[in-house]
Design a protein with these regions (language model features):
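Subset of Sec-pathway N-terminal targeting signals
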Residues: 1-37
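Flexible, glycine-rich loop/tail regions that form catalytic "lids" or insertion modules at the edges
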Residues: 57-67, 74-109, 123, 147, ...
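Extended, charge-enriched "interface" segments that sit outside catalytic cores
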Residues: 37-205, 221, 529
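Active-site pocket-lining segments that scaffold enzyme catalytic pockets across diverse folds
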Residues: 182, 186-246, 551, 557-558, ...
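Conserved phosphate-handling catalytic cores of large alpha/beta enzymes
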Residues: 366-377, 385-421, 425-431, 439
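Conserved thiamine diphosphate
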Residues: 281, 286, 379-405, 447, ...
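Cofactor-binding active-site loop characterized by glycine-rich and histidine/acidic residues
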Residues: 222-388, 392, 598-637
């Protein structure tokens, strides 16, 4: 059915009358629509100011076309480096809206696409393609909050969803791409067939991540907690966290035995790293890459918990000081249940962190499994739609688009405190790892990849054409990077047996495997316990307690005062109270944590008249530590 089939002049007349009497009662699109109509007839005399129903119907069709591009423009976007760009889509063709070539030069209302508020249809369509069907495809019309949608529209449409980067930024992107590519090529030559899970094919994430760091630092962010799997992990360590090449190369040397290190034994592409980046003389930012197992996405809730703990410690109620950043693979993001569970936690009171930036390195394959065998959805990121958050699909060989999207994503996260997903459509230059042969299962795909030039070469050609750099700059850049790589390799390879970086950080750096603490006395004086019990087992006079709970609290108090009949839940409450009054905070989380699964805890009491809650463990002393208890999502699988 044609979208405009239900549009008619009577309906438009009715909406127009509503707009004249109460404009705020209509959506922003309708307000723009009729404001544009008034603008269109403003140069006519009063007698001529009547509704041109033919023009209004055409305008309605144009408005429907604009809406369709906002909703489905991503279907026409050029996203896949290994496929030709789509030329047309039947749902986005003007003919689907009864618009013809005769309408192309007629002016219509399009406030965000023109400073005057009006533009020819030809110009509007071109603007829509540049905004929604170029290197970036956006899914955001599923968002139910009109403020979020309008904020995104205001950020994307006037500038065609792109940033005008100066020469300095473009040169920085070039440097990052060369560093990322030459690093992988160097290791491939020096450590032939050694597993490293190369980033090649997804190189554009390096300048994008570096751009994100600089952008969020300006917003007052002091820490990024990063979780990612093995793909590109060493490259990210080297070129985002600035881990020395010597440290990385030492793990490739055959004399290095990770079992010699207490608490280690893991492979090189699982290890974490902590760094403090000095961005300017007055600005620094800490990045902590969390250690990760081979179990894909297992790190996701660990990162979120780490971030929430850091935010609680810093009393960061606005969630602006610590940012969670998760890097996923496309197959794992769609396939692993832990991803969905972690997403579901994002807006829950006990778990929210103010929004996570999710980067999906979409190399369009999972080991040897193609997307059609790995998921039941068009995009690997479709599961994130349940959160009503924007999803940006980006061509993996357009680094400027990716840098732009990361900044837009960060701004959205800081504005609305919600997750945002960036799907980078790229490829992997080798098999699942460097010892894998992809030609066994995807010969056509990998022949195409084999013939494809590296991104750093293509971007260098682009900057040469734009006359931003000269050939000698490229040559010098390549020599400088290779010189650094060779110097680091010589330093490591020439030593008797290099010792790698420290595996423990700050609070953990003095931990020793054979350390055993002496027994300590954890007891509390009887009079202290009785005093705590009296506070735990009473409620304010104005609080109406359930009669059954009133009797339960009385029994608990009597048990403590008599020293006989203390049950498990009562003992737990006393132990919690003693710890809290000594200044140590307590957090309980899990389904039914407040009441207790077997109706035993009752740490949160509910007034039977008002429904308000009261937590005795938070009413023990003025200077006590906080007791936080959160019921959780159901997670039993």
């Amino acid at each position: 059915m044609n979208l405009t089939a239900t549009w008619n002049a009577d309906y438009i007349d009715a909406q127009y009358e509503r707009w004249k009497s109460a404009p705020d009662g209509l959506s922003q699109d309708w307000r723009y629509f009729f404001e544009g109509f008034e603008l269109a007839v403003s140069d006519k005399s009063t007698a001529e100011k009547t509704i041109d129903k033919d023009w209004l119907e055409r305008q309605a069709r144009v408005q429907a076309l604009i809406y369709r591009y906002r909703d489905l423009g991503h279907l026409l976007a050029c996203l896949d480096p290994l496929a030709a760009c789509p030329i047309d889509h039947p749902l986005l063709n003007p003919s689907a809206f009864n618009l013809t070539s005769e309408d192309l030069d007629l002016e219509f209302v399009a406030p965000r696409f023109s400073k005057s508020g009006r533009a020819p249809l030809r110009t509007i369509i071109q603007a829509l393609k540049e905004t929604y069907a170029h290197s970036i495809g956006v899914e955001f019309m599923h968002l139910q909050d009109p403020d979020e949608r309008n904020w995104l529209l205001d950020r994307m449409e006037p500038g065609r969803n792109k940033s005008k980067f100066d020469h300095t930024v473009k040169r920085r992107i070039l440097d990052n791409l060369f560093e990322a590519a030459l690093f992988e090529q160097f290791i491939n030559k020096k450590y032939i067939a050694v597993t490293r899970f190369s980033l090649e094919g997804g190189d554009a994430i390096i300048p994008a991540l570096n751009g994100l760091v600089e952008h969020v630092a300006q917003k007052g962010c002091g820490e990024i907690i990063l979780g990612m799997a093995h793909r590109g992990r060493l490259n990210v360590q080297a070129h985002l966290l600035k881990r020395p090449y010597e440290d990385i190369f030492s793990e490739f040397e055959s004399c290095y035995d990770p079992d010699d290190l207490s608490g280690s034994g893991d492979v090189k592409y699982h290890n974490g790293f902590l760094t403090d980046l000095q961005l300017t003389q007055s600005s620094s930012l800490r990045i902590f890459l969390i250690n990760n197992p081979s179990h894909l996405e297992a790190v996701d809730p660990v990162v979120e918990g780490f971030v929430r703990a850091r935010q609680d410690i810093q009393s960061d109620q606005k969630h602006s000081k610590v940012l969670p950043l998760l890097i996923h693979g496309d197959a794992a993001f769609a396939g692993q249940g832990i991803v969905t569970e972690t997403l579901n936690m994002s807006q829950l009171e006990g778990y929210r962190t103010g929004g996570t930036i999710h980067l999906v390195i979409n190399n369009q394959i999972g080991y040897t499994t193609l997307p059609e065998d790995a998921r039941s959805t068009r995009y690997s990121t479709d599961v994130a739609k349940m959160l009503m958050v924007p999803i940006f699909h980006v061509h993996g060989e357009d680094p400027e688009a990716l840098v732009h999207v990361f900044q837009l994503a960060a701004d959205y996260r800081w504005k609305f405190g919600k997750d945002v997903v960036i799907d980078v459509v790229c490829y992997r230059r080798y098999g699942h790892n460097e010892g894998d042969e992809p030609y066994f299962t995807q010969p056509l795909m990998y022949e195409q990849i084999r013939q494809r030039p590296s991104l750093h070469q293509m971007y260098a050609e682009k900057l040469l054409e734009e006359q931003i750099i000269q050939k000698d700059i490229i040559d010098d850049l390549e020599k400088t990077i290779n010189s650094r790589l060779n110097a680091a390799y010589d330093a490591v390879h020439g030593s008797e047996c290099p010792f790698p970086f420290a595996l423990f950080y700050e609070n953990w750096e003095d931990i020793e495997a054979d350390y055993s603490p002496a027994p300590i006395d954890t007891g509390v004086k009887e009079k202290t316990l009785i005093s705590l019990a009296r506070k735990l087992n009473k409620v304010p006079e104005t609080f109406t307690l359930n009669p059954k709970l009133e009797r339960l609290l009385q029994r608990r108090l009597q048990a403590v005062e008599s020293g006989y009949g203390i049950d498990w839940a009562g003992a737990e409450a006393l132990s919690f109270a003693s710890v809290l009054t000594e200044g140590a905070p307590i957090r309980l989380s899990g389904q039914d944590s407040g009441r207790g699964t077997f109706s035993q805890r009752h740490s949160v009491l509910v007034d039977t008249q008002s429904g308000k809650s009261y937590t005795p463990l938070n009413e023990l002393a003025e200077n006590q530590a906080p007791f936080r208890v959160y019921n959780s999502l159901l997670s039993e699988a």
